[in-house]
Amino acid sequence: MKTSRLPIAIQQAVMRRLREKLAQANLKLGRNYPEPKLSYTQRGTSAGTAWLESYEIRLNPVLLLENSEAFIEEVVPHELAHLLVWKHFGRVAPHGKEWKWMMENVLGVPARRTHQFELQSVRRNTFPYRCKCQEHQLTVRRHNRVVRGEAVYRCVHCGEQLVAK
């Protein structure tokens, strides 16, 4: 577990939350699911990811440091729910009805698919694109896909194709 820049108090708070929610789930489900492996290796704008086959949760240390309380309250149970759903139901839609049920009825946490953390410190170079209603910032990866003709992106609000400025 690479955790060199994270204060021990934050790491302990993450483990407390993980263990608390896992115990709650095991009690409500009548199971004894094991504690998942935890690492602080997630990069980019994702707060965390759940790796099903390796039964591992990867958390973003930068976003954790910048948003400790909300991160621990929301992201840790969010990723744990993915692992529990996989153990309990098998392969299902990532944020489907089983995940929502696990979040709300078992873990007692609002089922939100995305975080609302400020991303300036973790966002790499972006490229400005426009539609008819607003400006968008595309990541290097998405920009390169557009340049190579491999992808077309549309605005989720107006539906218009995004065009480089």
From Swiss-Prot:
The active site is at E79. Signal peptide: none annotated. Zn(2+) binds at H78, H82. SMART domains: SprT. GO terms for biological process: response to stress. One of its GO terms (molecular function) is zinc ion binding. This is Protein SprT. It comes from Escherichia coli (strain K12). The lineage of its organism: Bacteria, Pseudomonadati, Pseudomonadota, Gammaproteobacteria, Enterobacterales.
